[in-house]
Design a protein with these regions (language model features):
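Helix-loop-helix junctions within predominantly alpha-helical proteins
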Residues: 1-29, 62-158, 163, 170-189, ...
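Cytoplasmic, membrane-proximal interface of class
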Residues: 15-20, 44-50, 209, 215
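Membrane-anchoring/interfacial helices and their immediately flanking loops
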Residues: 17-18, 25-35, 39-42, 54-61
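Hydrophobic alpha-helical membrane-embedded segments
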Residues: 32-52, 144-164, 264-271
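Membrane-helix interface/capping segments
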Residues: 46-69
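Membrane-spanning helices that line or support transport/gating and their immediate boundary helices
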Residues: 52-59, 156-160, 164-171, 278-281, ...
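Terminal membrane-anchoring module of integral membrane proteins
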Residues: 73-76, 87-93, 159, 177-348
Length: 348
């Protein structure tokens, strides 16, 4: 896998150096080169932090699989279905774009620009190079699948945190269910022990989720930074290339690639926004629970949860940019700005 990725980055870099100065040819080389560079960064980080990632997955699965109430099981199942739906859509769009770009080369042109130590435009070198490209497509498909899995892994782990936060909110709302209340509307002494134990358990679960969010930021901050930095440029370069495409099939395949890269950024940003929303839900749930039936000691614990939730739970890129839909819109605006600059430069 490293060999295939390394070889392709080398030949694409060589082609970029060879056509340096020709804006149209440079953009034709750059959009796949940058995609592979971002993928290499993600893959390296995942391999380097694999033990911590495995621990995060194991800890989260233990809690989610251990749910016993009907409402909690339904919540876990809903988050799983949402993740599966996301994976299906993302993989469908991404693989259709990879397949389309690979097999949409025009006559006497290779599907993707790359540097070779011979003239690949003359026969029979062209046929052999094209055949090599098609065979290479199998390896690229595997690499593309792993690249997509890296993105889905982050989104799934964030969804795992969101699900755990949602379960905590449900536990708070049902905090005083099945407990005895005296004539004054206060829980009895025996029930106080039960509710106190529940609150302490909720506090511990909340702390574990916050710790998992910190671990996710530690693991994926660098690859997400690389993805965001590269994505805005890839989106504008692909749009610029589409302006010069005359082959309808290739135009459609490049449009699907543009959509795939946009989705690639979107799944990070929407996951980050939803994480913040579900975190705020915990604070609301603490206020909505029947705290007025509880003694002062339990109220203080609930207040601690509410105060902690005032600080939004977010994942940041290198501690600078929050992963949110606002960031997604900023990336799209930057892409459009780069696109207009390229257009203006090309018209000179």
């Amino acid at each position: 896998m490293y060999y295939v990725l390394g070889v392709y980055i080398i030949i694409q870099t060589g082609d970029l150096v060879q056509v340096w100065g020709d804006l149209t040819l440079m953009t034709a080389s750059v959009f796949m080169l940058f995609t592979n560079i971002a993928y290499a960064i993600k893959l390296a980080c995942v391999i380097q932090r694999r033990e911590l990632i495995q621990k995060i997955i194991f800890d989260g699965d233990n809690e989610l699989d251990g749910q016993k109430t009907k409402l909690a099981i339904q919540t876990v199942e809903r988050y799983r279905k949402d993740t599966i739906r996301l994976v299906t859509v993302y993989f469908s769009v991404a693989f259709s774009s990879v397949f389309g770009i690979t097999f949409s080369g025009e006559k006497d042109q290779l599907p993707l620009r790359a540097w070779y130590p011979f003239d690949a435009t003359k026969r029979p070198a062209y046929q052999w190079t094209y055949a090599y490209t098609i065979l290479f497509f199998i390896a690229l498909s595997i690499n593309a699948a792993v690249n997509l899995c890296c993105d889905v892994l982050v989104a799934a782990l964030i969804a795992q945190c969101r699900c755990r936060l949602r379960l905590i909110a449900q536990s708070l709302r049902t905090l005083c269910d099945d407990v005895d209340v005296d004539k004054k509307g206060r829980i009895t002494a025996d029930s106080e022990k039960v509710v106190g134990s529940r609150v302490r358990s909720i506090v511990m679960r909340h702390q574990l989720v916050l710790a998992q969010v910190e671990q996710l930021q530690q693991c994926f901050s660098v690859p997400i930074l690389g993805q965001f930095a590269v994505a805005s440029f890839i989106i504008c370069v692909t749009a610029y290339q589409m302006a010069f495409v005359t082959n309808l099939y290739r135009l459609i395949s490049m449009a699907s690639f543009e959509i795939a890269v946009t989705i690639q950024v979107y799944i990070y940003c929407v996951a980050g926004t939803n994480l913040t929303i579900d975190s705020d839900e915990v604070s609301r749930a603490a206020y909505e629970c029947p705290w007025y039936e509880c003694p002062a000691s339990i109220r203080r614990l609930l207040l601690v949860i509410m105060v902690r939730c005032k600080r939004a739970t977010v994942i940041t890129v290198a501690g600078i940019v929050e992963i949110s839909l606002d960031t997604f819109m900023s990336i799209m605006k930057a892409s459009y700005t780069f696109f207009t600059v390229l257009q203006s430069t090309g018209e000179l």
